[in-house]
């Protein structure tokens, strides 16, 4: 895939994270920009005694030139847009982002399944304060037992919690709408077993590190799932 589309190794193409942060940009431009920043910052971040003043000046100048050259070429940051929109107007009906790019689907490993997220702020039921962030996620194609239940809903949950933290709000409800919902033939027995489990453990609680100030600074260790009780695993085969 990467060779065919002349993309960096490991790239998924025009999908999810890339589309969220660099909507409309060319991947090659973004990758060249990132590699240039890494090169120049390597010199700038080194201790003074390991980098000559000339090298440091060269790196600073190169950094400025790269930023100027790529100004306006790195696409539209949809995540910043949603956060800034809700910060300015919590009642906005335009706080949405999308992963769906019909013009670049042929250059994605898989066209985005969870396609659009809409964020709605509602009042707190107790105080009446407008500070509860809800999310409505639309999914164009739903592998229900595997994709939706074990990945897509978690993604929407994490987005809701992280954006709420940026806005000083509380996470509220998550709504999911799906089209083309399906169960693959090689998942029917496993799904039947899953549905037979009528008594589920209590729901766990997701806690985020309150010291993280920027949504871009979260790391794996900043998420804590409390009270998770796992039932015996069910092995699903990946449908190809």
Predicted regions: what they are:
Residues 1-240:
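Terminal, non-catalytic protein-protein interaction segments that mediate quaternary/complex assembly
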């Amino acid at each position: 895939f990467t060779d065919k589309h002349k993309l960096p190794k490991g790239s998924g193409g025009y999908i999810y994270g890339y589309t969220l942060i660099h909507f409309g940009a060319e991947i090659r431009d973004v990758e060249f920009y990132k590699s240039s920043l890494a090169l120049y910052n390597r010199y700038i971040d080194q201790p003074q005694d390991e980098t000559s003043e000339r090298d440091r000046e060269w790196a600073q100048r190169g950094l400025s030139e790269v930023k100027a050259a790529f100004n306006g070429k790195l696409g539209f940051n949809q995540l910043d847009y949603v956060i800034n929109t809700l910060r300015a107007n919590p009642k906005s009906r335009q706080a949405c982002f999308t992963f769906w790019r019909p013009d670049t689907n042929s250059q994605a490993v898989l066209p985005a399944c969870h396609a659009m997220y809409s964020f709605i702020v509602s009042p707190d039921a107790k105080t009446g304060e407008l500070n509860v962030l809800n999310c409505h996620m639309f999914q164009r194609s739903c592998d229900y037992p595997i994709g939706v239940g074990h990945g897509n809903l978690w993604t929407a949950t994490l987005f809701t919690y992280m954006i709420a933290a940026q806005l000083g709000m509380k996470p509220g409800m998550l709504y999911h709408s799906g089209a083309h919902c399906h169960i693959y033939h090689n998942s029917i027995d496993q799904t039947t077993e899953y549905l037979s489990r009528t008594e589920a453990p209590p729901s766990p609680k997701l806690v985020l590190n309150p010291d993280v100030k920027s949504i871009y600074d979260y790391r794996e260790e900043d998420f804590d799932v409390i009270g998770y009780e796992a039932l015996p695993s069910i092995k699903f085969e990946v449908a190809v």
